[in-house]
Amino acid sequence: VTYYEESEKNVLRHIGYHRIEGFLQDSWKLAPRLTVDGGVRVAWIGPADDLEGRGIVVWDKARYDPQAPPSAVSGMTWHAIDPSVPTTGVRMPVFVTPRVGFAWDVAGTGVTVVRGGFGVYRYPDAPQFYGSMIDLAYGVRYFSTCCATSLRELEGLGTGEVIFGGQAVDKADDQQPRTLSWSLTLDRKLPWSTSLEIGYVGSKSDHQMNWWLDQYNAVPLGAMLDDPFGDANDYRPLPNYGNLYINRHSAYQNYHALQALLSRQRGRVNFTAAYTFSKNLGLKGADYNGYRANASEYAFDPREYNYGVLGTDRTHVASLSWSLQLPDVKRGGAWRALLGNWQLAGVSSYVSGAPLMGSFGIQGTTAGGAPISNEAITGSPDVYAMPVLVCDPRDSVPDGYLFNPACFTAPLPGANGSARQPYIKGQPYHNHDLSLAKNVPIGKGRRRLQIRVSAYNVFNHPIRFPDTTRNLTLVFDNGVQTNADFGKLPDDNKYGRRIVQLSARFEF
């Protein structure tokens, strides 16, 4: 038995929040060709609240006593034991969020228009993420013990220690998530009833919750190198706590994009072509598919370890939708009924591959025979073992692979790989849909029967995906990488097929 934990009760996690907002906005025509919009929103966005009344648990470092027993949960407080603490745990100020925009008709003819704007937006966290932060206030305690490898040792463990190893909010946190957004766009009318729109769009989101970076009681780097199989709690800075997750609004991200749109919505030929070139960077905390190098923004510099391309980044996104009304047949009778009123339409899309860095796994033994684990390589369960790169895996990629697997080598105890890994992308997505429709007039008026055949993924192009265990896991045997499928794009793990649909619709 290396670890055993038991919770003594279940709790009704009745979490919600309160929100009061008001706004003012107006529009001014400052000149015949210039219009400006402005406004301000004043909001009180309450933090997550325990609607049953005992309160969200708060971490107050000033109340922490290292000499107190673990069962005293020193440093923790909540409304039921200290009425000065609100049931929300923390208090929020009133937020003022301005926004402004403009439109400038350059020549006064409507042919060329420049638009831009800036705005600040506040919003609450989802309440369901706060459920475990009330457990302590309702008497939940955990029995936790470690570590027995034989029956004799198991008998000698005793009853264990009642500890708190959960979540709480930081007393000093008085923020709600914020996004600053701005844009500048040029609209231009072109010949053939076509319009072009090209612009820059940017945003910065800060005061984001530090999910997955909230380990407050992290084992220091290197502390367990000489004792990789020991109890991590013996090495934590706060000895009367285990894993301790203190949440605050300290994460951030930013987005920058060049966006273009070309469209024609008139006559027999209609189309819309859109393209976005973008980059999404930030702290890789709760970011899906983000490559986190450690679990603590408190113990380690988050900018050094966890800042980079987010899992939501897609460098290129392009789409084309179009429709073509085929020319009418001039001859009447059966020829017109057979060959007239046909419509052809299609949609094509392309999306760059998703970042793969966060999907990598590493296991096995080093060149010296040491097990590859966080404790053995970095000396801390809270700093993740990473491969050592000897070249850029985006160069000299073998056919059928997503990256060059020869660039990855095993780390050594005290010599971990870099926290900043190259931006490796997965397989791009592209798809084409096509439809052909025949409109048959019935009698007089607007009555008609439309018969349509549609083919989705018309070229029957499958999208292959790497399997995490087989294709994205490094397996080392005494420092030698033995997984021959690492980095390979498999032929048998693919999705997508052509779908043909027939439909009839009567309009009247």
Language-model-detected regions and their locations in the chain:
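Short, solvent-exposed micro-motifs at the edges of structured domains
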Residues: 16, 33, 45-47, 163-167, ...
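Solvent-exposed loop/turn elements at secondary-structure boundaries
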Residues: 53-247, 371, 406, 427
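Hydrophobic alpha-helical segments
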Residues: 23, 36, 113-114, 343, ...
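Surface-exposed patches in mature extracellular/periplasmic domains of secreted proteins
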Residues: 37, 111-115, 332-335
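Generic hydrophobic alpha-helical membrane-span motif
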Residues: 37-38, 125, 463
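Signature of Gram-negative outer-membrane beta-barrel scaffolds
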Residues: 1-107, 290-293
